[in-house]
Swiss-Prot record:
This is 4-hydroxy-tetrahydrodipicolinate synthase. Keywords: Amino-acid biosynthesis, Cytoplasm, Diaminopimelate biosynthesis, Lyase, Lysine biosynthesis, Schiff base. It catalyses: L-aspartate 4-semialdehyde + pyruvate = (2S,4S)-4-hydroxy-2,3,4,5-tetrahydrodipicolinate + H2O + H(+). GO terms for biological process: diaminopimelate biosynthetic process; lysine biosynthetic process via diaminopimelate. The record marks T45, Y108 as: Part of a proton relay during catalysis. The gene is dapA. Signal peptide: none annotated. One of its GO terms (cellular component) is cytosol. It is found in: Cytoplasm. PANTHER family: 4-HYDROXY-2-OXOGLUTARATE ALDOLASE, MITOCHONDRIAL (PTHR12128:SF66), DIHYDRODIPICOLINATE SYNTHASE (PTHR12128). The active site is at Y134 (proton donor/acceptor), K163 (schiff-base intermediate with substrate). It comes from Clostridium tetani (strain Massachusetts / E88). Pathway: Amino-acid biosynthesis; L-lysine biosynthesis via DAP pathway; (S)-tetrahydrodipicolinate from L-aspartate: step 3/4. Catalyzes the condensation of (S)-aspartate-beta-semialdehyde [(S)-ASA] and pyruvate to 4-hydroxy-tetrahydrodipicolinate (HTPA).
Amino acid sequence: MSIFKGSGVAIVTPFCENGVNFKKLEELIEWHIENSTDAIVICGTTGEASTMTEAEIKETIKFTVDKVQGRIPVIAGTGSNNTRKAIELSKWAKSIGVDGLLLITPYYNKTTQKGIVEHFKAINDDVDVPIILYNVPGRTGLNILPKTLVKICDTCSNVVAIKEASGDLSQIIEMKALLKDRIDIYSGNDDQIIPILSIGGIGVISVLANIMPKEVHDMCELYLKGKTKKALEIQLNTLSLTNSLFIETNPIPVKTAMNIMGIDVGELRLPLCNMDESNLNLLKKELSNHALIK
């Protein structure tokens, strides 16, 4: 059974002077539920987990689970390039009631394809909770190859899905051909939602949903219900805005956009920094063109 179908928001973490702005996070959670977001993915890349302390990560995940109260699935980013650390955080996340885990490939260490399998198997064997793998070689320097994914699925009963952000549609098609319905595929790129749905994907883990939650949900729902032309229209109509959210490293533009829109999510944490002025002007133009600001 799928953890979710449709739009899972890779939600930003709002910060304030004292740390995480939990009042704002609660507002965001309620806003997403009201606007039909299908799942919340907390403490991922867009949530700046890499600049948060372990205590902040745990408090943020628990707060989210407590506030959502089972209304939609909560998926926690508990991956690491330290297998033991990933196991410990994943065990803890299970204990407080998350619906799934998002596990990034082990970055920086430069392990082999065999090492990728063994890393995920170690987590799988110690933590009985649904797992979404996160393949984003542009960030990690490590690509889960299709045949490697087959080996993972053969040995890891809790691995139920993959967030595919390689951008390589040929690779994703090969994954689907090899595994059929043994694993769910989520788009990890907002500009490839429709292409990935068209080859059997079931949704997206989305950055765009932070500012257009209803539109991303509708795009997925329409496609999955067979209304493919209307779904494609949303993809095409939001494409220029989507592209503007990636003119600098995510989540710099999306967090900047939210602040411009009056959704005060606070500052970015170093080493992420404020946008270049020319890129900022382009972002503002796209927000205006899509009626998100006046």
